[in-house]
């Protein structure tokens, strides 16, 4: 997988920053200028160039056939800033679209009303504040290429202690006077208030990237929320409550000082050290320790399409014979991620059909010589994706998927 990210000013085409990820070389300036030139040319004709896909044949020495290298290009123009995203081997165009939205959001967290700025002022402001948003952009790119996180969804941790931790969080929320609070454990959200889940998914993701891209878990910074509040800043405060856990709150300037918020956080979680430690032990797996998953399952994705929550993990409970079938955690996660992209694209196509007799996708599966994948959806918008070893009979995958789906969701203590 390779991704280029080019940020330019719309008026002058001057580069603000350039980022790349994967096995790719730096783009020459002439290529950057050509990509921007395509966008400007179509814009002069009143045509908005949004996306295109190209493929080229790479010759292989002493071999007649050649493998096609397919690239997808995305152009986005917003508030005097042009973003060009180029991706190869990314799985789906939707990933690049989501990536572009998040990058614009990262810039918008610190720079507002960019369209009202003069060209020279805008460029100076973008350069000056780059140290604030570029680390977030790098974290977004890392998440897109690593294949261990779903962009467009909030990464969650399902621990058996979540119900008790949520009670402490609601107590803290009442004391600090904010409806927007969450507890982050190991870079994932364990529990959050209803107000936090009411935030747009993009706002939630960006705040999590802001926290996880920093070298410290303690913050008190003003931020704009691209969807909820693009022109009025909130205070984003994060307070460490354990070695790998932080309490996050969105509040206004009139709310309590950081010292008072810190005191409220310590009061709420003073006697909950054992609960936090138990939740942190779930981090590699993201599931309750006592929950047993069939040893023939290699990896799991669980999402809710309405709340945009997600869980993406590998199964650690496997026999030695199973572990030899597919080597490498990233390889098995990448296989399931590709199946996830294909399935969600199919769901989207079914839902956008103009026919009155729409088809609802409930189950889907795929088989290969080395593994099998299965997806199961319920009426509440929960979808589970499983990667099985190839030895599992195809007719048994539906039963196993439904059983694992029920075992996870019937655990009320995880607060899904």
From Swiss-Prot:
Expression tissues: Expressed in female, but not male.
UniProt main location, coarse: cytoplasm
Gene Ontology terms: cellular component: cytoplasm; cytoskeleton; plasma membrane
Keywords: Cytoplasm, Cytoskeleton
Cited InterPro entries: FUZ/MON1/HPS1_longin_1, FUZ/MON1/HPS1_longin_2, FUZ/MON1/HPS1_longin_3, Fuzzy
Annotated S-S bridges: none
A Pfam family assignment: Fuz_longin_2
GO biological process, one term: vesicle-mediated transport
UniProt subcellular location: Cytoplasm; Cytoplasm, Cytoskeleton
General function of this protein: Plays a role in the organization of cell polarity via a planar cell polarity (PCP) cascade. Involved in the development of the hairs on the wings. Specify the correct orientation of the hair by limiting the site of prehair initiation to the distal vertex of the wing cells. Controls wing cell hair number by maintaining the integrity of the cytoskeletal components that direct hair development.
Family: Belongs to the fuzzy family.
Protein name listed in UniProt: Protein fuzzy
């Amino acid at each position: 997988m390779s991704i280029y990210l080019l940020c330019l000013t719309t008026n002058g085409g001057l580069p603000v920053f350039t980022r790349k990820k994967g096995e790719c070389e730096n783009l020459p300036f002439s290529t950057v200028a050509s990509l921007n030139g395509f966008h400007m040319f179509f814009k002069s004709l009143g045509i908005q160039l949004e996306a295109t896909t190209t493929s080229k044949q790479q010759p292989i020495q002493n071999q007649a056939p050649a493998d096609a290298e397919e690239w997808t290009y995305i152009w986005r123009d917003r508030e005097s800033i042009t973003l060009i995203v180029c991706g190869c081997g990314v799985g789906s165009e939707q990933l690049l679209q989501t990536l572009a939205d998040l990058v614009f959001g990262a810039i918008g967290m610190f720079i507002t009303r960019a369209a009202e700025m003069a060209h020279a002022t805008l460029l100076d402001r973008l350069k000056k504040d780059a140290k604030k948003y570029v680390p977030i952009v790098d974290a977004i790119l890392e998440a897109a290429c690593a294949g261990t996180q779903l962009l467009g969804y909030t990464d969650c941790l399902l621990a058996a202690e979540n119900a008790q931790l949520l009670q402490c969080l609601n107590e803290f929320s009442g004391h600090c006077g904010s409806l927007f609070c969450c507890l982050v454990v190991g870079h994932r959200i364990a529990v959050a208030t209803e107000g936090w889940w009411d935030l747009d998914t993009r706002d939630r993701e960006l705040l999590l990237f802001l926290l996880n891209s920093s070298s410290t878990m303690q913050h008190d910074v003003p931020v704009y929320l691209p969807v909820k509040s693009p022109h009025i800043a909130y205070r984003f405060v994060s307070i460490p409550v354990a070695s790998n856990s932080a309490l996050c709150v969105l509040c206004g300037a009139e709310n309590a000082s950081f010292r008072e918020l810190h005191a409220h956080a310590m009061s709420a979680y003073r006697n909950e050290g054992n609960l936090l430690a138990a939740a942190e032990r779930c981090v590699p797996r993201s599931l309750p320790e006592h929950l047993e998953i069939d040893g023939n399952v290699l990896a799991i994705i669980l999402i809710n399409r309405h709340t945009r929550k997600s869980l993406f993990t590998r199964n650690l409970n496997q026999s030695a014979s199973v572990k030899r079938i597919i080597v490498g955690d990233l390889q098995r996660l990448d296989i399931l991620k590709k199946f996830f992209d294909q399935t969600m694209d199919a769901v989207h196509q079914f839902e956008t059909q103009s026919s009155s007799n729409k088809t609802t996708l409930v189950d889907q599966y795929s088989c290969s010589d080395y593994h099998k994948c299965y997806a199961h959806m319920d009426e509440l918008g929960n979808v589970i994706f499983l990667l099985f070893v190839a030895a599992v009979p195809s007719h048994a995958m539906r039963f196993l998927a439904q059983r694992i789906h029920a075992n996870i969701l019937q655990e009320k203590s995880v607060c899904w």
